[in-house]
Amino acid sequence: MNRKTKFFALIFGLILAQSLFNLLSAQISGKWHGKLIINEKTNLTVAFEIKGNKAGNLSSVMHSVDQKAFNIPVDTVYAEGNDVTIIINSLAAKYTGQLINKDGIDGHMAFPGGAQMKLDLQKVDRFPFSIAERPQEPKEPLPYFSDDIEFLNKKLGIKLKGTITTPSKEGQYPAVVLISGSGASDRNQTIFGHKTFLVMSDFLTRAGFAVLRYDDRGAAESEGSFLSATILDHAEDAAYAVDFLKSREFVDTLSIGLIGHSLGADIAPVTATINPSVSYVILMAGAAKPLQEIILEQCDAIYPTMGISDSATTLNKDILQSLFEVVRVAPDTKVAREQGALILKQFEERASALTQEDKNLIGYSTPLDIKTWSGLFIPYMKHDLFHDNERYLKQLKCPVLVIGGNKDLQVLPHHVKLIEDILVSNGNKRVTAKIYPGKNHLLQDAITGSPSEYGDIENTIAPDVINDIIHWLRTQTGRIPRIN
C-alpha cells in the first residue's frame, strides 16, 4: 500500500470511527429512567437526561425523583460499544450498564464502601414526573460579574474549580467563601433539587459582597480525592480559597469571611485557625458535638417522622455505636468493614423480631448486611466521626453569627445555644445567635422539618434568613449599598 492509499485509508478509518461514535451518541442521548433497588422492599426512581453535541460528546444531569432532587450535575458520561458509564462525583456514585436494545440499559450503581445497587434504565419520550420550580435561582442577565476560576491547594498541588461573583470590577468589596456540607458537593451545593450556594451567592452579590463558591475536592471539576478528604483537609482547601480572594484586586483583603452550612459549619472554625485573614464567620445549622453523636440524634429525631418504632430506633442506634467503635479502632476501612460484618451477627435476633414494616422503613435486609452501613466505611469517616468541633470553636475570636432552625432534624436546634455558649465562655464577646421558628436544616420555611420535604419546598432559603445574614454582614463590614 503506497503512502497516498495509506493516507486515505487512515482518513476513512477516522471518519468511520467518528460516524460510529456519533451514532452511539445519538442512541444514548435522551431521557432515561428506572428504579434504583436499595433492598427487597425499597427503591428510588432515578432519571438521566443525556445530551450529545455534534462532536459526539455527551453531557447529562440526574434526577432522584422520589427525593425531589433534580438537576444533579453529572461529571462524566461515555459509551463504548454497548457499555455505558455515568459518573456523579457529588454522590460519589458510578453507574455502569450495557445497552440491551435501543430503549434499554441493564446496569448497577456503585457507591463508596462497595455497595452495588441494581438500576435498569428505560428510554422515554417524556418523563412521568414534573421538575420542581426554583423561583430564587438567578436568571440572566445578571447585574453583577460572574467568573469561573481555579485556585491551587499548594500543599498537594491540586486545582479546585469554582465561581466568583462580584458587584463590580471597580472598587474593593468585602468577600465571603461558601463552605458546603457533607457529601461531595458541587460549587452550588446542589441538594434535593436546590442550588443553595447559587442562590446565596446571588443574594449576597446583589447586596454588595464578592462571593467565592467552589467544587469540593474530588467533586465536579475539582481535582483530588473526596473519599479520603477529612474535615481538616476541606478546611485547608477553604484556607487556600481565602488566599485566592486576597489576590483579587476588587476584594477588600481586610474583610474576608466564611459561611459554612451543616458540615461546612464544622469546617469553617478549622479554616479560621489555619488562615488568620478570616475576619468573620457565619455558622449555618452547624454542630457543637462530633458527627457520631449527631448521627444518633438524627435517629431519634427523624425515625419517628418515618413511622419507625422505638424498638427499631434503639436497635439501629446500638448497631451504629458498635460500628463507630469498630471504625475508631480498626487500622483501615477494609478491616473495619470485615469486623463490622462480624459485629452484626450479635444483633440478628433483635433484628428478626422487628416487624416487616420496620425492616422496610429502616432499610434492613435479612440477614443483616454490612452494606446497609457502607457509608461508615469511607476513608474520611475514621476522622470525621470523631472530629472535636469544640476544640476549634474555642479558638474563634472574630465576630460569629450562629443560626439554625427549630425544625432542623439533622442538626438539632439546641446546637445553636451549645455553640454560642462555647464561644462566649472562651472569651468571644462578638457572638450573635438565633434559632428561626419554622425553619429546617436548609433554613427553609418547613412543615415538619423532615428531609423528605426539602425538595417539595419552592424557596431554596427563607427570605428572612438571607436578609438577616446580609444585615449582619453589613454590620461587620460597615457597608455596602444594595445593587439590583
Feature map (PLM): residue ranges:
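Central antiparallel beta-sheet cores of small beta-barrel/beta-sandwich binding domains
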Residues: 27-100, 106-113, 143-144, 197
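N-terminal cap/lid segment of alpha/beta-hydrolase-fold proteins
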Residues: 128-171
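Alpha/beta-hydrolase active-site loop
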Residues: 228-249
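Catalytic active-site module of serine/aspartate enzymes centered on a nucleophile-bearing elbow/loop
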Residues: 439-442, 448-484
